[in-house]
Amino acid sequence: MIESSKPISIVGAGNVAVRLAFAFKNSNVHISHIANRTTETVKDLAESVGADVCEIEELPIDQITILCVSDDAIPSVLKKINHTTPVAYTSGSVSLETLSKRNHLGVFYPLQTLTKEKEMTLTHVPFFIEANSEEYCNKLI
């Protein structure tokens, strides 16, 4: 999973965001910020994992941001994030080629259904990882 020495950000408050946030925390990956369309919905999650809540446009540009949003929302959320920010999204059905050109864009897709209500460890969950460069792909592994 993503390098534990560098903080990350998460966008989203649904099933995948919640499960990944706790998995990252349990793997000692620091989540510095969590953002969502409405900041009210992420306050409890952010507090649980020790993250700050921010607007999508305010996400740090120097760390990986994981988009845990619906497939349809990915293009519009990407437009709100600084184009230099490294981003990975959690959809297996949205092609990298269909999205805006960015230096660091990737897919970080868990090959298992995740739900907020069911606590689980992700150590045995396979992830599909793809990126627009080999260098960035290696950062997501």
Predicted features and spans:
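Hydrophobic Val/Ile/Leu positions in short beta-strands of Rossmann-like dinucleotide-binding domains
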Residues: 9-10, 67, 129
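Short loop/helix-cap segments at secondary-structure boundaries that form the rim of catalytic
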Residues: 43-47, 59-61, 78-83, 95-103, ...
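Conserved beta-strand scaffold positions in the cores of enzyme catalytic domains, especially
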Residues: 34, 53, 87, 105-107
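NAD(P)+-binding Rossmann beta1-loop-alpha1 motif at the extreme N-terminus of oxidoreductases
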Residues: 1-55
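Rossmann-like NAD(P)-binding element
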Residues: 57-79
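Short, flexible coil/linker segments at domain boundaries that flank nucleotide/cofactor-interacting
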Residues: 2-3, 60, 122
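Rossmann-fold dinucleotide-binding core
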Residues: 89-141
